[in-house]
């Protein structure tokens, strides 16, 4: 993801998940020596030596998201594929209508969109700043 572009590619959660290569990387605690002590200790206890390291992760979540001035319950799903990017999709309800949202960073391009009924755009963003933000989000969420 070193090259930053602004044209997003239409990729589904399933397509991104299926595109993840089978990992051949094995966890070696010696690779953690450069990390701060707290991070190193956490990872040494969380991952068994010799364990295969994942090339992707798929998460399901629920919580609250602030849209406008109010908090709304949401359910979401996210796929992070280390060599391609991430997609996060969520659904919430406002005034009885489903609102569908998504953030994505795929192959160096990013987009954010929210749609009423999954059809009518209420917010869309793309471009270099959105891509930079999305790449930062992916890095932050890569701890999962």
Role assignments for model-derived ranges:
Residues 2-57:
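N-terminal leader/targeting segments and the immediate start of mature chains
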Residues 40-118:
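N-terminal mature ectodomain segment of secretory-pathway/periplasmic proteins
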Residues 114-144:
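Flexible, processing/modification-adjacent segments and terminal tails
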